[in-house]
Amino acid sequence: MKNTTTFGRSNFDRRGFLKAGGVAAIGTLAAPALLRAQDGPILLGHLTPRTGFLGPMGEYAIMAIDMATEEINAAGGINGRQVQFIKEDSVNPQTASTKAERMIERDKVVGIIGEISSASALTISQVAERGKRIFINTGSNSDTLRGSDCKRHMFHVESQNVMYVNAEGSHFLKEGLVEGKNWYVLTADYAFGHDLLNAAKGFLGRHGGNLIGDDLVPTDATDFSSLLLNIRQAKPDLVALNLAGTQITSFFKQYGEFGLEFPIGGFGFDTISAWAAGAENFHGTWPSVWHHRVETEKSQDFVKRFVAKYGKPPENQAYSDYMAVMIMAQAIRETQGTDAAEIITYFENPETKFDMMKTREGYFHPETHQLLQEIYAITALPADQVQNEWDIFTTSGPLPGADQPLESLIADAVGGTCSFAS
């Protein structure tokens, strides 16, 4: 599957949608060939699952990419240059690697944005590192990608697992669901789930909780009946889910059918899962990097524009891909080019900030390339209080609280130590 989207050509305001400091230095002279290249189009790649259990989220990512490109086009482009997106279905890790290599070697993209699967993100990052191209990960949560598998050319707009665990864990602590309590955990059996499980175990151990059940779930699983019987017999204080994609929706529906009433929550979540389950089946409290009920002026304006274009509110994957485009556009605009080394320097500069449409600006952690930004906890509304198919949860304020630094979200990270190759 291949699509091309084009930004318009002309001058995008240097202070447009996102703010920043720390402009990278550039030379004042250039060879004629370089000048010609700088007058040509900027080509970027977008890889994300459009099929399989992550496909529904991938479709939101595509919608966001298209909307972002149209908005930049309407604002005049980036430094007078057109930008083209080559968009492909990443399918699986092997296919993602092949397509990333083709984008770099044949299509000559200057960077790649996207992905949701942690396994595919790893293979894309390996190709991007060899090709010295920026890769902005928009949906893969694995702590290992920020740890032992980190890459100098890879940056993460999506929050990592430990950030969700620390944010959601603070809610469970306040609710008295950790110390001395028994958890039953279900985990998606791939890199994302494994990382999330390790982070959750670490949190539970640090705060005096007990793990009484721990099951790995194949990513293609649709029948949870045997696991639900185990949960019923175990009688946990909390059912914690580290599932992904359509797994969560299926579990919600079957959990309700079994009539189980144990508190439920988890550390990995996408709002599309709540919508797909519906108000009657959606339960518990979950972390979210962003959702359509975030009460800031810019977030609500973004929601209105998205609804006007697509007839439904944006999901958190749409938010992450949209922000990745704007962050990449900011870097190209501020460095006056597409050189990967200059963009890395710009991203790593502690003065470089990004307007995340929240109460605080975000910035990349220079030692791991993780974007630090606020997170939210959403809680299912009782079905009789739901007014429409979208507004089926309430939201916390931004996490961490205003009195805590964003770095607190990455405390006690697992996944190994990041060491960028020189």
What residue spans do the PLM features occupy?
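Extracytosolic ligand-binding ectodomains
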Residues: K2-F7, F12-G22, L29-A31, A37-S422
